[in-house]
């Protein structure tokens, strides 16, 4: 269904666990879902250096900093998320949800076992765009967050009929996002 309806671009039709001869955190099509990848553009971390508080109704971008993209010995690229910090990223993939399918983005157990929490986020019927991924390092140590590798999984739920009013129909505020999009009211 995902490839026929072009729901995911670019689409990896099989679960990839290796790239360039190195093990990666899995990405691509899985049993009833898709392991989405974190892109190497737009990643930001909340910091008190410039921001005093976070107000989701009046979001101030100065509360975010852009961390350095690092390269591991094996060539893998990653961001280092400090202990007890929260970050925002965006997926490599662009999603286009049909009117009869809703998705739910959840975290991966590989990251959860290392202390990383990925916020559960719906991909409503009719929504399209690159998904903003909200992540938290709950550990007491800095945590590597790899780009172009799996960051979470999307589970798909298909209905027998189209929804009456889609995310697009009601003019959803995050419709068509192509990069990191901050909180809106």
Can you name each region flagged by the protein language model?
Residues 1-185:
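Non-catalytic terminal segments and appended small domains
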């Amino acid at each position: 269904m995902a490839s026929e309806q072009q729901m995911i671009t670019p689409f990896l039709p099989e679960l990839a666990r290796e790239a360039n001869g190195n093990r990666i955190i899995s990405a691509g099509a899985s049993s009833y879902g898709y392991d989405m990848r974190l892109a190497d553009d737009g990643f930001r971390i909340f910091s008190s250096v410039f921001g005093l508080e976070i107000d989701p109704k009046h979001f101030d971008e100065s509360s975010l900093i852009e961390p350095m993209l690092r390269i591991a010995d094996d060539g893998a690229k990653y961001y280092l998320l400090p202990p007890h910090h929260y970050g925002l990223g965006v997926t490599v993939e662009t999603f286009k949800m049909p009117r009869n399918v809703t998705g739910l983005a959840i975290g991966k157990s590989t990251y959860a076992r290392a202390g990383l929490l990925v916020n559960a986020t719906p991909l409503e019927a009719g929504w399209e765009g690159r998904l903003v991924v909200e992540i938290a390092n709950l550990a007491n140590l800095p945590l590597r967050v790899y780009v172009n590798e799996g960051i979470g999984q999307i589970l798909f739920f298909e209905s027998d009929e189209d929804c009456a009013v889609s995310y697009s129909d009601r003019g959803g505020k995050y419709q068509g996002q192509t990069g990191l999009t901050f909180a809106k009211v």
